[in-house]
Amino acid sequence: NLFWKSYGLASVVKSSDPGENPGSAVNFPLNVLVAEGLLEYGFKSEAADLISRLMQGITQSHLREGAFRYSYHSDKGTGMGERNALNGLAPVNLFLKTLGLQIVTPHEIILHGFNPYPWPVTVKYRGTTILCQKDKTTVIFSDGQTTTVSEEGTHKVSMDRSSGS
C-alpha cells in the first residue's frame, strides 16, 4: 500500500523529491479516524497495527526530543512541526478501546476479547493492574483479588467487596 508506512498512514503519496515534503508526514487526527473506522467495522488487528505504528513514532520521537510533535515522519518516525502540540499526543483512549479494555471504576473492568497487539500490555489504574496477553487477561485488584479470563467474548470483572471486610 502506498499510504501504509512504518509509522502510520502518510498524508499523501511520497513525491520524487527526496527532501522533507508534506507527504511524508503522518496526520494524527486522520490516522486516529481511520483506526476508529477500522475498529468499528471489525478490523481489530488492522486497527491495532495502525495504532502500534503511531505509538512507535510517538515514543521514539519523545525519547529523542523529550517532546511531542505536531506530526511524525511516516518512514523515519522523527518528529515534525510544532513541539508539544496536542495533535501529537498518544491516542490512549483508542489504544485501550482496541485492546478491548474498558475501565468502569478501579473495582470494575469490562474486557472485550483478547489483546490484538504483538506484545503483552500491562495497564495500571488506581491500584488495579490488568495484564493483557494474546490468549488471556489477568486483573489484579488493589486488595490482591485476582481474576483470569481465558475465554473470548465480553466479560465484566468486579472486585468482591465482601471479602476482607
Where do the protein language model's features map onto the residues?
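C-terminal capping/lid segments that line or modulate ligand- or cofactor-binding pockets
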Residues: 1, 21-130, 135-136
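Short, surface-exposed linear patches
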Residues: 2-6, 116, 153, 161-163
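C-terminal beta-sandwich/jelly-roll accessory domains of carbohydrate-active enzymes
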Residues: 124-165
